[in-house]
Regions:
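A beta-strand signature from Gram-negative outer-membrane beta-barrel systems
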Residues: 129-175
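Membrane-embedded beta-barrel scaffold of Gram-negative outer-membrane proteins
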Residues: 302-318, 437-440, 466-523, 528-530
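Structural signature of Gram-negative outer-membrane beta-barrels, strongest in the C-terminal barrel
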Residues: 346-497
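Gram-negative outer-membrane beta-barrel transporters
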Residues: 349, 391, 489-498, 516-600, ...
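C-terminal beta-signal and adjacent terminal beta-strands/loops
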Residues: 495, 543, 594-601, 609-611, ...
Length: 666
């Protein structure tokens, strides 16, 4: 199965790479000067080839070209990423970078991190793409040294940037979108933008999603094959977002945001033979407000400050005779107060220094008897220095972390203190070629979450932080190969990660206990290629592909049966290929997303194996203007081959489905 998968994926990648190899001998180095302008424009859209650490970017135009309408769909196109998807339209979706786990991946929303001190991971399904201008994924320490200290405190970061209002002939913009699809999907979206005087503007965004999620799937039990229907997979969610933008010239700029999310969804659970009963439900309610202020003095000194308040409530309920009283209900309330300030000093054109400091207070209240009710103070300070010239970029940073917890009941953990360094370099050895060599190192850790420390009977206040060391070396190259290929971009990175004191759940007599028992070694390669090929007049073809190889093995104990086995839910081979044909009539995009065999449990035996899959999708769209309105019609067919597969074992993904959307911009 694995060999067949590799052959198929290699054939698909090779089929469109062959013309590039044949044309490489026709490289005209004199065209380089045209591309230097592309790198300058990278200040708006970060240049992925100039970075000293791996960076992948997808802007609004790229998402529309690929027909992407969901954040997790976009992230799956990035190399080195595993999206844990529990199936269904409303299923939990988290992001893991290079097998380090979702708790090592930060998620930022307009420059301010989104956090969950209880679980340590962020569900990206709660964010909409309809008001997003760009997403980016950085691995290691990004070259942008003027960011919050929290962004230094993770192994990788998924950054979501929403669209700011852009006014042309009138002082307002309006946007309406209706999306429907299989399994009862209905998703209306409304956005309104208003200019207020010369210095202010505002936007309002509303997004409601409803779906039954009752999709069919094939259940195989030995020789018995049955057709089943997923139950209790419905979702209802509402997103509201308001933004205010102020531009004061020499007085700087101020952005404010208010965000509200409310959802109710069923948890279909794993598929159990001869038992389709599922009554688990979860309610989520999240509100946050954040402010960002930025100013520049004397063209050499920049200042920024952020403030955020976050409220999060969740209710879990399961109805079953196994509980006393016939049901189990868990209530959790989190509050966060967060502040950040930073300065960037540029004494000369090539050298910059930054100092960023954050402070946060997190609390958790739940309905458990004698609950610890923890309160956590976190202080982060990051100092960075960067040298950046057309030939060389070198960045070094040092992060200082101090964390202390207080509890109302039970024992509290020891305070956590640590210094975390990072170094990266990018070098362009040939003046006439846009070819760069890069290398980076980062030492980082994650503190145990509230669940790790305090969860009923499983928590362990003696846990140490989980440490991760990252090494990366690679190269990037982009240029025009010939008149037939407008732009070819390539990045190849090899990496080695080491995780120690990994926090895992270990069976202990009659219960499971969180322990520092794991050690993991991760070796891998990430490859990204893109090409823009003009065909004829208004016809063009955009090709994108990514490939990842990850050898992530458990090296904890040579005596254990899973020693040097691949860690759970990490495919050795994964990748994606997209081909977009743009023309004056209908734009067509074909996408393939693939992952090799994985294992659901630490032992790599057949009973734990999850088969590889290849998902094919097709998207068509057409935009046209009518009077003062711009219309866009899009249709998508997902999982063209109607193949049943799991990303998480026993959580089947939907088969063939369709989506249709109509948007109007005025």
């Amino acid at each position: 199965m694995q060999n067949l998968f590799i052959k198929r994926l290699s054939g698909l990648l090779g089929a469109w790479l062959f013309p590039f190899v044949a044309l490489y001998a026709q490289v005209d180095t004199t065209t380089y000067h045209q591309l230097s302008g592309v790198e300058v424009l990278g200040k708006v859209r970060p240049s992925t080839t100039r970075e000293s650490t791996p960076l992948q970017v997808m802007d609004k135009a790229g998402m529309e070209r690929l027909g992407v309408q969901d954040l997790s769909e976009a992230v799956k196109r990035f190399s080195g990423v595993t999206v844990q998807d529990y199936g269904g339209i409303g299923g939990l979706k988290t992001v893991s970078v290079r097998s380090l786990g979702a708790k090592h991946t930060a998620v930022s929303y307009d420059g301010v991190t989104v956090t969950d001190a209880q679980s340590g991971q962020v569900d990206i399904s709660r964010f909409s793409l309809d008001n997003v201008d760009m997403i980016s994924l950085s691995i290691g320490q990004a070259d942008d040294i003027f960011q919050t200290a929290r962004m230094y405190a993770s192994a990788g970061a998924l950054s979501i940037k929403t669209a700011a209002p852009l006014f042309k002939e009138k002082s307002y913009n309006a946007y309406v979108k209706l999306k429907g699809g299989s399994f009862g999907l209905f998703n209306p979206v409304v956005r309104y933008e208003q200019r207020i005087g010369n210095r202010w503007s505002a936007s309002l965004h509303a997004d409601w999603l409803s779906a039954k999620g009752d999709y069919p799937f094939t259940l195989i039990n030995g020789k018995e094959v049955t057709e089943e229907t997923r139950k209790n997979s419905d979702v209802q969610s509402l997103r509201l977002e308001g933004n205010v933008y102020g531009h004061f010239g020499q007085g700087g700029k101020l952005n404010g945001k208010v965000y509200y999310y409310d959802s109710e969804r069923g948890l279909p659970g794993s598929v159990i033979l001869y038992n389709s009963n599922a009554r688990e439900r979860v309610w989520d309610n999240n509100f946050f407000t954040q402010l960002h202020y930025e100013n520049e003095w004397f063209d050499r000194l920049k200042f920024q400050a952020n403030a955020k308040y976050n409220y999060s409530f969740s209710k879990y309920r399961d109805i079953s005779n196994k509980y006393s009283g016939g049901k189990q209900e868990d209530l959790n309330t989190q509050n966060e107060y967060y502040g950040s300030a930073g300065i960037l000093y540029t004494p000369c054109s090539y050298v910059s220094f930054s100092l960023n400091t954050d402070i946060a207070r997190n609390t958790l209240v739940n309905n458990f008897v004698n609950a610890p009710t923890p309160k956590r103070w976190t202080s982060l300070t990051a100092f960075a220095i960067q040298y950046k010239s057309p030939v060389l970029t070198a960045t070094a940073s040092l992060l200082s972390t101090y964390i202390t917890d207080k509890v109302e009941n039970g024992d509290r953990p020891a305070d956590k203190k640590r210094l975390s360094p990072a170094v990266s370099i990018s070098w362009r050895p040939f003046q006439e070629q846009s070819f760069r060599i890069r290398a980076s190192y980062k030492d980082i850790f994650r503190v145990p979450t509230f669940t790790d420390l305090y969860y009923l009977r499983m928590g362990n206040v003696n846990l140490k932080p989980e440490k991760a060391t990252q090494y990366n070396i690679g190269f990037t190259w982009n240029d025009e190969i010939s008149p037939f290929i407008r732009l070819l971009s390539v990045s190849v990175d090899g990496y080695y990660n080491k995780v120690s004191d990994k926090i895992v759940a270990i069976p202990n007599m009659y219960i499971w206990k969180m322990m520092n028992m794991g050690e993991v070694e991760i070796k891998g390669i990430d490859v990204n290629l893109s090409a823009n090929i003009p065909l004829y007049k208004a016809f063009s073809l955009l090709l994108l592909s990514s490939y990842s190889y990850q050898d992530a093995i458990d090296v904890t104990d040579p005596e254990e049966k899973n020693y040097k086995n691949q860690i759970p839910y990490t495919p050795r081979h994964s990748g994606s290929v997209s081909a977009s044909l743009e023309n004056p009539w209908v734009n067509v995009t074909y996408t393939l997303v693939a992952a090799g065999d994985r294992y659901a449990l630490p032992q790599n035996i057949e009973a734990n194996q999850i088969d590889s899959y290849i998902e094919h999708s097709l998207s068509v769209n057409r935009s046209f203007a009518l009077k003062k309105c711009t219309f866009k019609v899009q249709g998508d067919i997902l999982n063209l081959t109607d193949k049943t597969y799991d990303i998480i074992q026993y959580y089947p993904m939907p088969g063939r489905s369709w989506r249709f959307s109509l948007s109007i911009t005025y």
